[in-house]
């Protein structure tokens, strides 16, 4: 008799379909056992996607924790969870672990304190907000991969999102200009590589391999060679020889190859070689080149990639230093300080850098007039924060047109004595800001890529906003020390 009832088919109708299980599968759950001893089918207020998880749990295919998102419904099935709270947001019931919701959102922490007699089921009080937008908030808080737009930021502020102490740093480099340290030029972000060439052929040439690729570019090429083994830089220069030629030119001979001198080698990491090739010095037109690289066979190559940069907007520059005092929280303590990049671009009327002052410094008259009448020809280089030691900063957010393009921690730095030359070539002239309070000097960590030896720059055209997120609400002041780079 027991075998017969164990094989009984039990049907569960959802709002958009149905499931069938045997009595043997559901009999350990008292709710379903008591029902299916009497009837053969029931209806539940769940859709098929949601009930699929319940069926898998009853079949012992997944753990109970997977059902937490549906805890409010499945508790009617006798599937209980400890430390779970329920909220009604815009007509949809959300289930959370109490520790999660109180540690991530100040709103729910206060909600639970204000209604101690209702817990754990707070659904009798409607939170009159969009449940779709709240779902977006949850998705962001759980993975923090999607960009923060203006609507999402409003929702995060409403619910009092408490960011992780371990901030996930990132930078979207497509928005930034950049400069290679040691060079007198920077690259406009509009002319950064639109493609990466990774496909190449390999020809056996005795004790060397010749790597060949076609590259369509006008000027500068950054070549990244990843090695499987490590080698000292001094030994590397004799093992790699490079040759760039126009398409359809004759096969290069030994005399056409150049050794990898320190001029072309930008950087050598443990297993990575960064090479810069300035094609514009030879040809200066926008065509296809044949790239040939002879590499000794005792160098095991993992991959080679070519980053092609249009040379049309490689710009020379002059540095112009400036500073600004930011006072915040005059009326009440705040935990975010918002600074628009536009406000850092000083005007002639309130700056010592007047037309005559700039001309007296030896700056070209055309450059001075471009500055006075057209300030969008500026990027900001080496933005530094002088912050009193009692103020703790969680992280920095950089926004462009309401989209977060960088999240970064601050890095404490030590100033380098300025070079007695003008314009600067690589090393920047940075003068410490004097203060009668103990302060420390910081820079935005993600704006400096140590591997590629690249500095990312903030430009006027980004419509950038700098958001300083404090660990605790406070009021006071800080100073910004920064330099303009006027390009021409």
Curated annotation (Swiss-Prot):
Gene3D superfamilies xref list: Potassium Channel Kv1.1, Chain A
Coiled-coil annotated residue ranges, if any: none
PROSITE patterns: BTB
Ranges for domain BTB: 83-150
Superkingdom to which the source organism belongs: Viruses
Entry-linked InterPro entries: BTB/POZ_dom, SKP1/BTB/POZ_sf
Family: Belongs to the mimivirus BTB/WD family.
Name assigned to this protein: Putative BTB/POZ domain-containing protein L674
Originating species: Acanthamoeba polyphaga mimivirus (APMV)
């Amino acid at each position: 008799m027991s075998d017969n009832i164990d094989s009984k088919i039990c049907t569960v109708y959802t709002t958009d379909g149905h499931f069938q299980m045997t009595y043997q599968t559901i009999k350990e759950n008292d709710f379903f056992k008591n029902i299916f001893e009497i009837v053969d089918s029931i209806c539940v207020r769940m859709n098929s996607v949601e009930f699929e998880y319940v069926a898998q749990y009853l079949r012992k295919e997944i753990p109970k924790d997977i059902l937490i998102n549906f805890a409010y419904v499945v508790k009617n099935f006798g599937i209980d969870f400890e430390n779970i709270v329920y909220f009604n947001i815009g007509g949809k019931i959300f289930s959370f672990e109490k520790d999660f919701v109180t540690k991530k959102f100040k709103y729910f922490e206060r909600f639970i304190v204000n209604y101690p007699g209702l817990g754990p089921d707070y659904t009798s009080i409607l939170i009159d907000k969009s449940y779709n937008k709240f779902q977006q908030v949850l998705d962001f808080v759980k993975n923090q991969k999607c960009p923060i737009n203006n609507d999402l930021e409003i929702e995060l502020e409403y619910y009092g999102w408490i960011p992780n102490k371990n901030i996930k740093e990132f930078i979207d480099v497509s928005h930034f200009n950049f400069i290679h340290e040691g060079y007198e030029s920077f690259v406009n972000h509009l002319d950064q590589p639109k493609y990466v060439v990774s496909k190449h052929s390999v020809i056996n040439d005795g004790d060397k391999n010749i790597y060949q690729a076609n590259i369509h570019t006008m000027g500068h090429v950054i070549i990244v060679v990843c090695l499987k083994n490590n080698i000292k830089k001094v030994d590397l220069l004799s093992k790699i020889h490079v040759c760039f030629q126009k398409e359809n030119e004759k096969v290069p001979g030994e005399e056409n190859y150049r050794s990898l001198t320190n001029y072309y080698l930008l950087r050598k990491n443990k297993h990575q070689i960064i090479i810069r090739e300035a094609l514009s010095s030879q040809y200066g037109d926008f065509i296809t080149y044949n790239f040939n690289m002879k590499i000794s066979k005792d160098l095991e190559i993992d991959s080679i990639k070519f980053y092609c940069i249009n040379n049309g907007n490689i710009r020379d520059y002059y540095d112009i230093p400036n500073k600004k005092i930011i006072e915040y929280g005059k009326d009440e303590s705040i935990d975010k300080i918002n600074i628009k990049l536009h406000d850092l671009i000083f005007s002639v009327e309130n700056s010592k850098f007047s037309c005559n002052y700039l001309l007296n410094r030896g700056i070209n008259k055309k450059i001075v007039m471009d500055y006075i009448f057209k300030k969008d020809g500026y990027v900001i280089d080496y933005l530094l924060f002088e912050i009193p030691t009692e103020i703790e900063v969680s992280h920095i957010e950089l926004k462009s047109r309401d989209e977060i393009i960088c999240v970064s921690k601050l890095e404490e730095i030590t100033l380098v004595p300025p070079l007695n030359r003008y314009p600067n070539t690589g090393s920047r002239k940075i003068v410490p800001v004097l203060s009668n309070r103990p302060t420390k000097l910081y820079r935005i960590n993600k704006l400096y890529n140590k591997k590629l030896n690249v500095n990312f720059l903030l430009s006027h055209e980004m419509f950038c906003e700098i958001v300083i997120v404090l660990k605790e609400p406070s009021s006071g002041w800080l100073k910004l020390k920064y330099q303009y780079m006027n390009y021409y």
